[in-house]
Swiss-Prot record:
Role, per record: This protein binds specifically to 23S rRNA; its binding is stimulated by other ribosomal proteins, e.g. L4, L17, and L20. It is important during the early stages of 50S assembly. It makes multiple contacts with different domains of the 23S rRNA in the assembled 50S subunit and ribosome. The globular domain of the protein is located near the polypeptide exit tunnel on the outside of the subunit, while an extended beta-hairpin is found that lines the wall of the exit tunnel in the center of the 70S ribosome.
Keyword Nucleus: no
Origin species: Herminiimonas arsenicoxydans
Keyword rRNA-binding: yes
Keyword tags: Ribonucleoprotein, Ribosomal protein, RNA-binding, rRNA-binding
UniProt protein name: Large ribosomal subunit protein uL22
PANTHER family in the record: CHLOROPLAST 50S RIBOSOMAL PROTEIN L22-RELATED, LARGE RIBOSOMAL SUBUNIT PROTEIN UL22M
Length: 109
């Protein structure tokens, strides 16, 4: 049995999100939540929210036992880029790229 949770359009770069996702892939959900709770990274709080949603989906929709769940798959894909400009010297402008990503979490036993 597998249950999914998806969060799209997160204002976090995919590279920074993958650093956190790689740490919890394949772990039991209680160990993964504990690791995410004490991680100082911005992506940890966001991924924790998605993981909690996947756990709630498994419990409510499939009647799964939380103690037996583990993170089957987790991946972070590139999302749309917001392009902004900032003023520079002599009338020039530089582009600022604000990255976003999509987070996909699957839990199962």
């Amino acid at each position: 049995m597998e249950t999914k949770a998806i969060l799209k359009g997160v204002r976090l770069s995919d590279q920074k999100g993958r650093l956190v996702a790689d740490q919890i892939r394949g772990k039991k959900v209680d160990a993964a939540l504990n690791l995410l709770q004490f991680s100082p990274k911005k992506g940890a709080a966001i991924i924790k929210r998605v993981l909690e949603s996947a756990i709630a989906n498994a419990e409510h929709n499939d009647g799964a036992d939380i103690d037996e769940l583990f993170v089957k798959t987790i991946y972070v894909e590139k999302g749309p880029i917001l392009k902004r400009f900032t003023a520079r010297a002599k009338g020039r402008g530089d582009r600022i790229s604000k990255q976003s990503c999509h987070i996909y979490v699957t839990v199962g036993n």
